[in-house]
């Protein structure tokens, strides 16, 4: 098997509540994540959803990361539509090249055995 070095995440956010500090403006959570704004809006890359036990649930790629990740939480046809409540952590790697995104996504799905990916699965 070929060996591909997976890039380190540029952004990692976890589901959490905002601390009750009166000095800070209240942040409206997006699907339980108050740090969603840290995910790049106009960058392409790959993203990984994990549960609270750090098990990989889903891997995806996008030309616009934040928009695509939000769509997974709102879309009625997303492969994780019945499992959204399991997502506790999101990792994002900025990858500009579309071909590299495709390679990383397929490699991660099949070497780390993501639980809810349907396409590009060769290990089942």
Curated annotation (Swiss-Prot):
Single biological process term from Gene Ontology: nucleotide-excision repair
Disulfide topology: none
Database matches in InterPro entries: GIY-YIG_endonuc (IPR000305), GIY-YIG_endonuc_sf (IPR035901), GIY-YIG_UvrC_Cho (IPR047296), UCP026568_excinuclease (IPR014527), UvrABC_protein_C (IPR050066)
Domain GIY-YIG: 42-118
Positions of transmembrane segments: none
Protein name: Uncharacterized protein YurQ
Organism: Bacillus subtilis (strain 168)
Gene name of the encoded protein: yurQ
């Amino acid at each position: 098997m070929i060996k591909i070095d997976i890039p380190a995440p540029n952004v990692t956010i976890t589901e959490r509540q905002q601390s009750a500090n009166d000095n800070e403006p209240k942040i409206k959570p997006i699907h339980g994540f108050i740090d969603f704004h840290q995910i790049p809006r106009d960058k392409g890359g790959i993203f990984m959803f994990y549960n609270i036990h750090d098990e990989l649930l889903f891997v995806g790629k996008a030309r616009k990361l934040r928009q695509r990740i939000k769509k997974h939480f709102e879309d009625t046809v997303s492969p994780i539509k019945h499992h959204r409540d399991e997502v506790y952590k999101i990792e994002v790697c900025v990858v500009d090249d579309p071909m590299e995104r495709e390679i990383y996504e397929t490699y991660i799905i099949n070497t780390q055995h993501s639980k809810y990916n349907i396409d590009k699965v060769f290990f089942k």
